[in-house]
Amino acid sequence: MRLIQSEIENFPYQRLKKAAHMTAVEAASHMGAGCSGAAFNVLSGNDEPLDEFEPLVARLRQTRAFYDLMARHLGRAQPIGLYTAWNKDQAAAGDFINHPGWAMGHLGQGSQILEAGLPAAYQAQGSAVTLLFPQSVAAMSPEEIRKALAGGVYTDVETLNLLNQLGYQELTGMTAEQPHPVDCIEEFTAHPLNGPFARRQRDCRQSFYRVSGYVGYVLKKSDPKVETLARLVDYSGKELSSCSMATYENKLGGRICVSGYYPWDHLHSLSKSAQMKSVMRWLARDRLPAYVASYHKVNLWVREPKSGRIAIALLNASFDAADGLDLAVATSAGEARVFDMQAKEQVIRASNTDGPYRRFVLPAVEPWTMRLVVVGACEASF
């Protein structure tokens, strides 16, 4: 499909309710996520002068060149990265258990992972990692479940239990026992995926945030190849769980990481965001096309057009400027073209190499502003 339009609707069309800048950013983010353009439903329907909307229309006109660049370089290639395993059959799965709200309850739970600078994907085909939820499993065929478990999966205990109940324990490698609903603190082990953050702690304050399914669990290894990334201790330092987060490589060659303590929340500390990026690289076997290696709050959409070019749309999702934003790109190219929202171009060189990734430190990105980064010598086409 060549044209996938999104609608930017500023209902109830009162100018002070939404900034012109954010309206322009919203359209660009939709294009980054896969749309080929945007239709703007932003003007008043009343029989009155439209003078108050002139600044809004002017901003959209100023941003048109950036939209054109995005359409040209992103083309119709699909975003590659972390797939949240949503499908349209989940609503029916919720109805089947007489709990219709359950089917969509996970939507948005993966947002904190994606906000740390990991690329989003919206289809299983071509995705590098699957973020798996019980709602997803309930609406997947056995073949789809096995295919996911033969790739890279990050998940929680609720999903682990469901997978095991369905007979996939040989592929998950572990079980969950002894839930601890209070006074747990996550402590990182000296595992290589934790890098320099061994013994760092993450306290999610269970007494404040009583989130269903987020109690601290003891993960039991059903295969000795399971490796421990974190344990749980209480406020006195006493161990409550010798294993609360673990990784496993199964007989299909798939890799799985299970977190038994706030797997989708409270992920934005330096140590935890760094750990999650290392975990996602491991799960993907370094097939992530790009990610933000520095400590910034950034949303990322990455495409690989057929020409071999990598095109990246990124959003600084913070009210602070992103200085020193370090973008890791799976490429052998030594230069990247960076376009701001005024369509001004800068060419930057890779600062260093990290395995299959070249690292590019971008010029400062203003708060809640986007960039288009293009790496590779071939012209994109669509």
Predicted region positions:
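A glycine-rich, often tryptophan-bearing local segment used as a flexible ligand/cofactor-contacting loop or short
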Residues: 136-208
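Hydrophobic targeting/anchoring helices
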Residues: 1-108, 185-217, 229-233, 237-250, ...
